[in-house]
């Protein structure tokens, strides 16, 4: 991922330094397990020496890999040189026990899954923070009236707090999915060339995985099956889609013609090189753009599931790009989403103006039901309501200041509703008498 979107914490997790540090820890733990097992000759003293002297140098690893064309062998060679550097001349080299009975993928796959759990922990924290902001702001804006839209068209009144509440619930589901995906990918495997433990005792796998906080794969091939990784990638794509949904709503509400909400615009910020008046929703647009990357990378993960026989390497090159990019992009998205949610500026007066923009047609469903209650059929009531609404639409489309929807109903003999009935109907809060239950449910939402 390019530096522009790489956060320090997430970037470190997918750095070579972190990967090599995890590799080193796995190799040391494997030596300690072998010493405890006591079946291959390594002593506890040698394992302790390996623990104390194990090290690596990234630049040196790169130099060795330029010759070997094999990253694991290059790393092991470099690590071994540090382990043996202070061994007395003529003594047996402790490094001979490093990687004993293991294959490269035992190291690489176990380390990768550990990295992915580290990365998941960051995303879980960020999603949790965004969800808590949404829950708090939902209650702050529970009485901020706005228009609800379906198909982009004004539908019925609602409150802006309901928007925040909906996002809080969706982020909670993402939080649950991320935690489940983390558990699903938290596996290690140290089982040899094709998973048979032909040259290594299963105890080593169990020992290393327990120390790392991983479960041991019950039956791996040479690799940990990629359905684990595909499931995680699918969850990342879902979280990205949630971010995109919120950001898309932000963009739509910030349009000049709507202007009910606006993302933070900092002092000194510029909107356009050519048009100084512009205040563009660039944060929300960035979130939408990066969502496409994360969603597309999920397809890569699903394509990586079908490997040849017990393993091929076709997944490796794709994973090196797609996994890091997805986590780094989503981390950036969530960081920006948190900024957007916390700093979102709302314009209640503009919301009120938009509520009145359709001249009362928002109340058509209430009028329909009230007419049905007078005893006429639904079809007859629908005809009365629609015919008057279409006249209002026509006035709006032609830029005319014609009668409001209520005024047209009052002038229509087919509408038998009284003034008192219409007063009750044309109250936007009449739509929200039962919305209290939504906030009672939201109050019980546990985001810890």
Roles of regions detected by a PLM:
Residues 1-191, 197, 201-207, 216, ...:
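A helix-coil-helix interface module used to build multimeric assemblies
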Residues 11-15, 60-62, 269-289, 311-325, ...:
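Short beta-alpha connecting loops at secondary-structure transitions
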Residues 293-376, 384:
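Long, amphipathic alpha-helical stalk/connector segments used for oligomerization, subunit docking
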Residues 207-223:
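A short, charged helix-loop
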Residues 30-33, 123, 127-130, 134-137, ...:
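Amphipathic alpha-helices that form helix-helix packing interfaces
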Residues 32-33, 115-127, 236-245, 250, ...:
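Alpha-helical support elements that line or immediately flank enzyme active sites
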Residues 139-161, 260-264, 268-272, 277-278, ...:
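Glycine-rich cofactor-pocket loops
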Residues 228-260, 267-329:
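A conserved active-site cap/scaffold subdomain adjacent to cofactor or substrate pockets
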């Amino acid at each position: 991922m390019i530096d522009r979107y790489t956060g320090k914490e997430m970037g470190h997790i997918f750095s070579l330094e972190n990967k090599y540090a995890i590799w080193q820890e796995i190799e040391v733990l494997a030596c300690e397990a072998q010493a405890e097992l006591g079946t291959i000759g390594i002593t506890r003293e040698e394992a302790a020496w390996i623990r104390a002297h194990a090290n690596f140098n990234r630049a040196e690893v790169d130099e060795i890999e330029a010759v070997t064309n094999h990253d694991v062998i290059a790393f092991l060679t470099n690590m071994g040189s540090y382990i043996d550097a202070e061994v007395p001349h003529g003594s047996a080299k402790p490094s001979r026990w490093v990687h004993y009975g293991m294959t490269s993928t035992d190291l690489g796959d176990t380390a990768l899954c550990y990295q992915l759990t580290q990365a998941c922990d960051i995303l879980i924290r960020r999603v949790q923070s965004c969800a808590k902001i949404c829950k708090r702001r939902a209650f702050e804006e529970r009485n901020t009236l706005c228009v609800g839209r379906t198909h982009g068209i004004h539908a019925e009144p609602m409150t802006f707090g309901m928007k925040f509440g909906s996002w809080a619930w969706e982020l909670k589901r993402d939080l649950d999915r991320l935690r489940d995906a983390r558990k699903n990918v938290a596996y290690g495997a140290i089982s040899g060339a094709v998973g048979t433990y032909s040259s290594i005792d299963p105890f080593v796998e169990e020992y290393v995985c327990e120390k790392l906080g991983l479960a041991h794969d019950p039956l791996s091939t040479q690799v940990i099956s990629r359905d684990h990784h595909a499931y995680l990638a699918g969850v990342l794509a879902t979280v990205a889609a949630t971010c995109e949904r919120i950001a898309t709503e932000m963009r739509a509400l910030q349009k000049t013609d709507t202007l009910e909400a606006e993302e933070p615009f900092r002092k000194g910020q510029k909107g356009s090189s050519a048009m100084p008046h512009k205040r563009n929703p660039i944060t929300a647009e960035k979130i939408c753009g990066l969502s496409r990357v994360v969603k597309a990378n999920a397809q890569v993960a699903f394509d990586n599931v079908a490997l040849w026989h017990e393993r091929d390497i076709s997944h490796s090159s794709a994973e090196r790009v797609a996994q890091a990019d997805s986590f780094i992009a989503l981390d950036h998205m969530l960081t920006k989403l948190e900024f957007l949610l916390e700093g979102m500026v709302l314009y209640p007066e503009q919301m009120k103006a938009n509520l009145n923009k359709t001249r009362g047609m928002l109340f058509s469903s209430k009028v329909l039901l009230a007419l049905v209650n007078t005893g006429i059929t639904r079809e007859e009531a629908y005809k009365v309501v629609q015919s008057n609404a279409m006249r209002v639409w026509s006035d709006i489309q032609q830029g005319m200041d014609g009668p409001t929807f209520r005024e047209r109903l009052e002038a229509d003999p087919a509408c038998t509703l009284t003034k008192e009935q219409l007063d009750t109907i044309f109250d936007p809060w009449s739509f929200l008498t039962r919305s209290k239950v939504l906030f009672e449910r939201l109050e019980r939402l546990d985001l810890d």
